[in-house]
């Protein structure tokens, strides 16, 4: 009997390089309910057709490599490969296309945002056939989203914990963000909470530096919270930043926060990483802590319009990984188009079911089923004159965060907090009475300032400030 010289896998195998579109461009493919769908903005190199560029993205982010390999015969590529099933031209842009790619669910580990991103965007962005590449949106199928815990608690549970309903929540980032001692930091926290804010916040880069170690900060902030709660009769919180150099240290800080009895901790989810974030979210659910998420580093990824990843993808990923709040920009003063895009991903954070709407940047219908929602946080350069617009745009399920708009009050931190609380209560009351906040906003603030010297002073200071 002659020895076997040819394996079954090698039958029909032909070495060499072949066009990606022969295997990975499948315009007749009908997407499945279980597929993860991606919309990529593709800018091909000169001479590369959009179908080949889209197929290259599908290949390199799933089963493909640069050459044909004989081990392809050991598996079913048709079952596991990503498929570029449609391309379309981006209106008004030269040589830009949207390539739609479908990925079989079996390519992804359950409950791992880390693995999902490693597959879809991990290796393909440096591809030579592409001049630029941007991931615009993802459709997460129910069969995959159900493998994630999602936010530790969600919007309704947070309201029940805080016993606060029918209005946006108010926050303030303590400034200067770096340099204060723990005791002075705690003093600022107390003054803001005592004045009427619901939350104060560590800034994203407040971790455990020589001038203020984390344990000292946690202790003085907890003292401030309890003192303010006793004086106001309201539940208060401070976002204690648990972000650290290792997951073990991060969890240690969260454990200490829980032992102090505070309601909420914080994490920088992009610099900390999705694995760390998901670990912290699981700990927070198990131990009754709310989790505030800061998006530090997001602009490195999402600022370029033709390369990187849109923030709506990072927002969806955060909802899966876990967080009860996330920063979402302010909208105020931006162009109308930017407003619609921002409200698009705000809905993706809060709502259970979001219809496809290209005018708002939503490429796919998204059904989150029962996954809890995330509260968007409006923060950055806002003050009392913006309160009517913010209340109208973001609605009740939001946190409006005034850093300089609180601490910059000429009379001090507590009067700054009073001014913001009075402005918010006036806007909510006016809205509930049927008044138009967009049209009558300035008048509503002026009327309220007659009864609040703190608000009147704030109105005077910031009357000339515009975006």
UniProtKB/Swiss-Prot annotation:
Binding site for substrate: 123, 173, 177, 295, 327, 379
Co-factor binding comment: Binds 1 Mg(2+) ion per subunit.
Catalytic residues (UniProt): 175 (proton acceptor), 294 (proton acceptor)
Residues recorded as bearing N-acetylproline in the entry: 3
InterPro entries in the cross-refs: RuBisCO (IPR033966), RuBisCo_large_chain_AS (IPR020878), RuBisCO_lsu_C (IPR000685), RuBisCO_lsu_C_sf (IPR036376), RuBisCO_lsu_fd_N (IPR017443), RuBisCO_lsu_N_sf (IPR036422), RuBisCO_lsuI (IPR020888)
Needed co-factor(s): Mg(2+)
Domain of life, per lineage: Eukaryota
Subunit structure as annotated in this protein's UniProt entry: Heterohexadecamer of 8 large chains and 8 small chains; disulfide-linked. The disulfide link is formed within the large subunit homodimers.
Protein purpose: RuBisCO catalyzes two reactions: the carboxylation of D-ribulose 1,5-bisphosphate, the primary event in carbon dioxide fixation, as well as the oxidative fragmentation of the pentose substrate in the photorespiration process. Both reactions occur simultaneously and in competition at the same active site.
Protein name in the entry: Ribulose bisphosphate carboxylase large chain
Organism per entry: Serenoa repens
């Amino acid at each position: 009997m002659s020895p076997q010289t040819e394996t079954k896998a090698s039958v029909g195998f032909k070495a060499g390089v072949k066009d990606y579109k022969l295997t990975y461009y499948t315009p007749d493919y009908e997407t499945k309910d279980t597929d993860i769908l991606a919309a990529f903005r593709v800018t091909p190199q000169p001479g590369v057709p959009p179908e080949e560029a889209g197929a290259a993205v599908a290949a390199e982010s799933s089963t493909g490599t640069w050459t044909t390999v004989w081990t392809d015969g050991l598996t079913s590529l048709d079952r596991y490969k990503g498929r570029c099933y449609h391309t379309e031209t981006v209106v008004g842009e030269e040589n830009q296309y949207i390539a739609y790619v479908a990925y079989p669910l079996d390519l992804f580990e359950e409950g791992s945002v880390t693995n999902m991103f490693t597959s879809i965007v991990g290796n393909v962005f440096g591809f030579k056939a592409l001049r630029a590449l941007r991931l615009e949106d993802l459709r997460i199928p129910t069969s995959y989203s159900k493998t994630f815990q999602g936010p530790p608690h969600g919007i309704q549970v947070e309201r029940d914990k805080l016993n606060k309903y029918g209005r946006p929540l108010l926050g303030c980032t303590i400034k200067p963000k770096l340099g204060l001692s723990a005791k002075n930091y705690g003093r600022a926290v107390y003054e803001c909470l005592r004045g009427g804010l619901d939350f104060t916040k560590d800034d994203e880069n407040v971790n455990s530096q020589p001038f203020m170690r984390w344990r000292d900060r946690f202790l003085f902030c907890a003292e401030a919270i309890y003192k303010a709660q006793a004086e106001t009769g309201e539940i208060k919180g401070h976002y204690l930043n648990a972000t650290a150099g290792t997951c073990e240290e991060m969890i240690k800080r969260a454990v200490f926060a829980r032992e102090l009895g505070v309601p909420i901790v914080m994490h920088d989810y992009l610099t900390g990483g999705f694995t760390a974030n998901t670990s912290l979210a699981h700990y927070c659910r198990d131990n009754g802590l709310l989790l505030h998420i800061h998006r530090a580093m997001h602009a490195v990824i999402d600022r370029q319009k033709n390369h990187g990843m849109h923030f709506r993808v990072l927002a969806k990923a955060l909802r899966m990984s876990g967080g009860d709040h996330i920063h979402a920009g302010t909208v105020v003063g931006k162009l109308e188009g930017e407003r619609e895009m921002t409200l698009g991903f705000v809905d993706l954070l809060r709502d259970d079911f979001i219809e496809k709407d290209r005018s708002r940047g939503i490429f796919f219908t998204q059904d989150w089923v029962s996954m809890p929602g995330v509260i968007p946080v409006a923060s950055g350069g806002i003050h009392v004159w913006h309160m009517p617009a913010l209340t109208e745009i973001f609605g009740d399920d939001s946190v409006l965060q005034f850093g300089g708009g609180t601490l910059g009050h000429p009379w001090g931190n507590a009067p700054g907090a009073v001014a913001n609380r009075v402005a918010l209560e006036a806007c909510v009351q006016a809205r509930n009475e049927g008044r138009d906040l967009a049209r009558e906003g300035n008048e509503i603030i002026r009327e309220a300032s007659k009864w609040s010297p703190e608000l009147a002073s704030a109105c005077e200071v910031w009357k000339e400030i515009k975006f």
